[in-house]
Amino acid sequence: DDGEPSTSADTNGIFELPNDPQDIISFGGSDNSSGVDLTNLSLSYKASSSTSRVVSALTSLDYANTGSTDINTLLNLDSSIDIYSDNPVTGVNSSSAANKYYEANAQIFVLAYALQAFVNETNTSSNNTKTFFESLYTSIQQNFDSGVINLSEFIETSSFIDGYIDSVLSANNISLSSSASDDISSSVSSDLKSIVKSVVEKISVRNDSTATSAITNYATGTFLNDVIALANGTADAVRIASYSSNLNSLIASDQNIDES
């Protein structure tokens, strides 16, 4: 807004702002590893006195948090992890807690941004990610309140992903029908749920850092293009089916790494 401090991040995502507690909202940008332009990406950060501030998918999820349960508890992250100051990328392989933090942050990003891409392509709209983090938080909180334990694992399941996607499609007036016309067919909805689940559960820290990066780069690059293709009706059916049968091959071919 006018009169508020603003800045731009450098190519490494580093930024400087006045050292006083304030909410931080970022718009746009690209993924530094994959080079993908992240159209209408919006990330958020609640006001904090921390001198080192990390704006991420998890701080954006917490920005939507209106309850009394913190994100670490909701997603079973170790209490030593400070999502507001610990960089989820640079800490990879320093500890099992740091690896889980990286995985959860990447998964939350994919769940929010993939649905943003699908909805915006389907509705010819330009919603930013804030709305989708809010929907995702609501789904997570509802499952937590219903007694689901170990939500960091549960967000990888069909039960969670299907319910979350259904709620997003409904909130954006995208209904199911037997034809593609103005709505989407039930088969497209099923395909979307399937490929999102396949990618979310694939995201993890591997012993080989090249494999870890390849999975994440694929998830923030080619996978998003496939989501958009599903939305506009140009997706290749064989390729979409491969997400369930042979995702490793898709990633290896796209990222030029060994499939094993």
Please name every model-derived segment.
Residues 1-260:
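Feature for extracytoplasmic/surface-facing segments of secreted or surface-associated proteins
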